[in-house]
Amino acid sequence: MMGDASLSVLASSQVVAEGGNNFLVPNGTFFFVLAIFLIVLAVIGTFVVPPVMKVLRERDAMVAKTAADNRKAAEQFEAAQADYEEAMTEARVQASSLRDNARAEGRKVVEDARAKAEQEVLSTLQLAARQLKRERDAVELDLRANVASMSATLASRILGVDVAPAAATTSATKTSGR
């Protein structure tokens, strides 16, 4: 065992003597790569990140504005919907009122027309009754005037004897009771 340890110490010392590439000790390439990395990081941090952050902030602001606009539009839509419903309810009430008024006016017109027609019928009936009474009175007067001569003619035909009209008038008046 001891031989193995001394062998490894010997190998290390030989490596150090040859040029010393010890992996535990950083060499110049590492520092050069580190410097390039830091320079690239600084360039990206200075020139790339701020515009990207600006675009991201603008996009966040745009999203927030869009969300606010959507909420506002939804509220306006609900308000418009409520106004529409209210207007429709009012219009339905008004239409119902107009329909009821039209029905009432229609009934009134029908009743007025019916009353006017009944009045015209009554006046026509009264006119006809007066005309019939006048005609009846005229016919009655005519018959009263001619009853004596008609009675005499009828009696002459029935009896076969010539009867005088004056006698027929007296007998007709006594018979009728007037």
Swiss-Prot record:
Its main location: membrane. It comes from the Bacteria. It is a single-pass membrane protein. Disulfide bonds: none annotated. GO terms for cellular component: plasma membrane; proton-transporting ATP synthase complex. The chain crosses the membrane at residues 30-50. Keywords: ATP synthesis, Cell membrane, CF(0), Hydrogen ion transport, Ion transport, Membrane, Transmembrane, Transmembrane helix, Transport. It is found in: Cell membrane. It holds the Pfam family ATP-synt_B. One of its GO terms (molecular function) is proton-transporting ATP synthase activity, rotational mechanism. PANTHER family: ATP SYNTHASE SUBUNIT B, ATP SYNTHASE SUBUNIT B', CHLOROPLASTIC. F(1)F(0) ATP synthase produces ATP from ADP in the presence of a proton or sodium gradient. F-type ATPases consist of two structural domains, F(1) containing the extramembraneous catalytic core and F(0) containing the membrane proton channel, linked together by a central stalk and a peripheral stalk. During catalysis, ATP synthesis in the catalytic domain of F(1) is coupled via a rotary mechanism of the central stalk subunits to proton translocation. Component of the F(0) channel, it forms part of the peripheral stalk, linking F(1) to F(0). F-type ATPases have 2 components, F(1) - the catalytic core - and F(0) - the membrane proton channel. F(1) has five subunits: alpha(3), beta(3), gamma(1), delta(1), epsilon(1). F(0) has three main subunits: a(1), b(2) and c(10-14). The alpha and beta chains form an alternating ring which encloses part of the gamma chain. F(1) is attached to F(0) by a central stalk formed by the gamma and epsilon chains, while a peripheral stalk is formed by the delta and b chains. Belongs to the ATPase B chain family. NCBIfam families: PRK05759.1-3. HAMAP family: ATP_synth_b_bprime. This is ATP synthase subunit b. The gene is atpF.
